[in-house]
């Protein structure tokens, strides 16, 4: 871990007592003129420069921000490894309410901090930051992706994210039912924002039956008007209890799989775009005990990170789609490893990712 001499005591406590992941570097950033306070955490650069987004969030204190950055950076190492990218994992968090303090001056200052790492960290969008923000950051830092097409970027990544989740569903169907086709399968989608909407399109094109819910009723109404065959239910609680549900796709908030939802879930497969779907590590065992196949979220939702990584080399949609299509094979390999080792799929994915990172370190 990097030297953080002079950091507040609560931050030091978080760094040295909460970091069990062997992070390589943590940078505390402050620019008084713009009001910037940020944390950049690099978990691993074994496979290449750390890649991960910038989260802009009103954390209660610096220690909470550091803890989130450490956790998110570690997650990106595993995601990037399983996506087959030549990138390690990193994450940055900017402390504060973006609605209150986000400014061009602050984003430019942040870009200078990222640039000071000399390419060890490549940033992108995350919660609270958008394509337009990355355009500003890129004015001070060439190690920025997730930019607008007008500024050399690829733009919205929801198309490839949904395509990757769709490939994960096909892999689950192949593993469980011996056939990757989703025709006549019933798929329930919780959250039909940009990613969920595109996922609906893929499923309908293949002849699946689709059931949806979203807290934004106007979004659901627009979707069902456009696709009358789509069935809407009141809420997620109703969705997970739908009779004869084959696949459940959490595509909204994290923690969708928990002690309350798993016991009543009727689906045989869980495969969705939401991050951090498992509320706690014991949930996956609960799923397995009920005979429910779980496709690890960070594997199947990797289409977005595949896109932003490709942007660094001059974005090509067809090349990205071909890479995202490999999520099918990767997911099948995870299920096979899980069966071979007698462990849940998420644990199998972690083992494969750790093996790839260890092999990369050994080659150095």
UniProtKB/Swiss-Prot annotation:
A matching Pfam family: ELFV_dehydrog
**Source organism, top-level taxon:** Bacteria
EC number(s) on record?
1.4.1.23
Where in or outside the cell it occurs: the entry states: Cytoplasm
GO BP: any one term: valine catabolic process
Q: Record-annotated residues binding NAD(+)?
A: 191-197
User: Pathway, per UniProt?
Assistant: Amino-acid degradation; L-valine degradation
- Family, similarity comment: Belongs to the Glu/Leu/Phe/Val dehydrogenases family.
Q: Which leading EC class covers this enzyme?
A: oxidoreductase
SUPFAM superfamilies (UniProt xref):
Aminoacid dehydrogenase-like, N-terminal domain, NAD(P)-binding Rossmann-fold domains
Q: Report the function annotation for this chain.
A: Oxidative deamination of branched-chain amino acids. Oxidizes L-valine and L-alpha-aminobutyric acid efficiently, and L-alanine and L-isoleucine less efficiently. D-valine and L-glutamate were not substrates for the enzyme. The catabolism of valine is the major source of fatty acid precursors for macrolide biosynthesis and a vital source of antibiotic precursors.
One term of GO molecular function: valine dehydrogenase (NAD+) activity
List the catalytic activities from the record.
L-valine + NAD(+) + H2O = 3-methyl-2-oxobutanoate + NH4(+) + NADH + H(+)
- Which keywords label this protein? Branched-chain amino acid catabolism, Cytoplasm, NAD, Oxidoreductase
Assembly and partners are described as: Homodimer.
Q: What is its main location?
A: cytoplasm
What regulates the activity here?
A: Inhibited by pyridoxal 5'-phosphate (PLP).
Q: Which GO terms describe its cellular component?
A: cytoplasm
List the protein's name: Valine dehydrogenase
Active site per database record: 91
Q: Per its UniProt record, what InterPro entries does this chain match? A: Aminoacid_DH-like_N_sf, Glu/Leu/Phe/Val/Trp_DH, Glu/Leu/Phe/Val/Trp_DH_C, Glu/Leu/Phe/Val/Trp_DH_dimer, Glu/Leu/Phe/Val_DH_AS, Glu/Phe/Leu/Val/Trp_DH_bac/arc, NAD(P)-bd_dom_sf
